[in-house]
């Protein structure tokens, strides 16, 4: 379900916990804990593996914080970037920032130390924050796809207003907060005795009922279906119809041709965002599904390492989006450059071209005004 305190923590034997977490240790009374067999040592305790994990997580955090902060900054700063679609994109960036700043540092610490040293409050907060952010991202990507489908496929003249877009964003966070709440509620911060007089602090899922409760499995499978499979199905259907419409559309006039090309490029960019999100989260979702179906997966020697690698792959989606925006969208590329140069206006770059194009656009709009006007407006990102 989340990176902190999975069912593995509760199902390991005392000997397995001792071997994986520590290696040679002494008890508070000075008794030596026997050295574990080399083949039993958890790989995440090896120095070279820990160095790789530190580099991976720190790189994701650094790239994510810089990239997502930049996206939010340019959408707020430049008036021409304040479109409905860009507000939704900025919301994705906020969700990714939550993961970068509130989840990943503590997840890395927990993975390296083998026990939860951050206290009971963060034990409940960190898994909840990650679940919340992922669900916000999924809902936002679905809303973007449905909005573009509505405008482009059906040629609707009325677009979502900025006020309505803020309402949708608020609802996305509210719904996600409710759906992710079990991750905070059904959690236990406790001491686990490894050997007599030797304990570690654990942060684990604790569902009501028996020790191996079905509630956790039901929640995990429901989340997979409602917040991954179903949204991706809706998004795939929407973008398939959008792409079909764009390929079959014939625009009269040079200005409309230009906007048609922009629509295609923007659609490609947003499809790539969805693909990156879906592919990066697929291994972790599949692995969690395997755990839910067969709990013996928890007994794998390298369970923790496999889970950590899949978690790192999933977290790559938190910094990939700004790279895609800068690579595939000229408006974002110009906005990023303007922000780095501390320029106050976005049109400071290629300003003469912008003025000329605006004049041509106004002339073409007067000549070609008609039922396709809404189609032309649909994807100004």
Swiss-Prot record:
Q: Which GO terms describe its molecular function?
A: neuropeptide Y receptor activity
Specify where the region named Disordered lies, as residue ranges. Answer: 1-35
Q: Name one GO cellular component term.
A: plasma membrane
Kindly list the residue ranges recorded as spanning the membrane: 52-72, 87-107, 125-145, 166-186, 217-237, 269-289, 305-325
Give the chief site where it resides: membrane
Question: Please, where does S-palmitoyl cysteine lipid attachment map on the chain?
Answer: 342
The alphabetized UniProt keywords are: Cell membrane, Disulfide bond, G-protein coupled receptor, Glycoprotein, Lipoprotein, Membrane, Palmitate, Receptor, Transducer, Transmembrane, Transmembrane helix
Report the Pfam families cross-referenced here.
Answer: 7tm_1
Concerning SUPFAM superfamilies, the annotation shows: Family A G protein-coupled receptor-like
Record topology, Extracellular segments: 1-51, 108-124, 187-216, 290-304
Q: How does it sit in the membrane?
A: Multi-pass membrane protein
Show the InterPro entries listed in the entry.
GPCR_Rhodpsn, GPCR_Rhodpsn_7TM, NPY2_rcpt, NPY_rcpt
For the Cytoplasmic compartment, the record's topological domain ranges are 73-86, 146-165, 238-268, 326-381
Q: Does the keyword Cell membrane apply?
A: yes
Cystine links in this protein are 123-203
Which positions does UniProt annotate with glycan attachment? 11
Q: Where in the cell is it found?
A: Cell membrane
Its biological purpose is as follows:
Receptor for neuropeptide Y and peptide YY.
Give the family per the record: Belongs to the G-protein coupled receptor 1 family.
Record protein name field: Neuropeptide Y receptor type 2
Species of origin reads: Macaca mulatta (Rhesus macaque)
* Gene for this chain: NPY2R
């Amino acid at each position: 379900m989340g990176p902190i305190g999975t069912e593995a923590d509760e199902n390991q034997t005392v000997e397995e916990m001792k071997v994986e977490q520590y290696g040679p240790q002494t008890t508070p009374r000075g008794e030596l804990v026997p050295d574990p067999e080399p083949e039993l040592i958890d790989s995440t305790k090896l120095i070279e593996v820990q160095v790789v994990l530190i580099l991976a997580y720190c790189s994701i955090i650094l790239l994510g914080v810089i990239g997502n902060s930049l996206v939010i900054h340019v959408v707020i700063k430049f008036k021409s970037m304040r479109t409905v679609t860009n507000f939704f994109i900025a919301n994705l960036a906020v969700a990714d920032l939550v993961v970068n700043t509130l989840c990943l540092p503590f997840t890395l610490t927990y993975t390296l130390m083998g026990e939860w040293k951050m206290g009971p409050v963060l034990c409940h907060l960190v898994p909840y924050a990650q679940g919340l952010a992922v669900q916000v991202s999924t809902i936002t990507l679905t809303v973007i796809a449905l909005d573009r489908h509505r405008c482009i496929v059906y040629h609707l003249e009325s677009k979502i207003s900025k006020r309505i877009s803020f309402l949708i964003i608020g609802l996305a966070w509210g719904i996600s907060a409710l759906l992710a709440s079990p991750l905070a509620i059904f959690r236990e911060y406790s001491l686990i005795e490894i050997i007599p007089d030797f304990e570690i602090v654990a942060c684990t899922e604790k569902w009501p009922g028996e020790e191996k409760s079905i509630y956790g499995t039901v929640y995990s499978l429901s989340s997979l279906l409602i917040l991954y499979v179903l949204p991706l199905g809706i998004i795939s259907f929407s973008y398939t119809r959008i792409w079909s419409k764009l390929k079959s559309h014939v625009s009269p006039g040079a200005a409309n041709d230009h906007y048609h090309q922009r629509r295609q490029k923007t659609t490609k960019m947003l499809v790539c965002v969805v693909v990156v999100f879906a592919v990066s989260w697929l291994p972790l979702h599949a692995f969690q599904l395997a755990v839910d179906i067969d709990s013996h997966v928890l007994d794998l020697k390298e369970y923790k390492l496999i889970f950590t690698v899949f978690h790192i792959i999933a977290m790559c989606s938190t910094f990939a989006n700004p790279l895609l925006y800068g690579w595939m969208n000229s408006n974002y590329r110009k906005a990023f450059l303007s922000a780095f140069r501390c320029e106050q206006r976005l049109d400071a770059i290629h300003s003469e071209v912008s003025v000329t194009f605006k004049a041509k656009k106004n002339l073409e709009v007067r000549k070609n005004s008609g039922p396709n006007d809404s189609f032309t407006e649909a994807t100004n990102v």
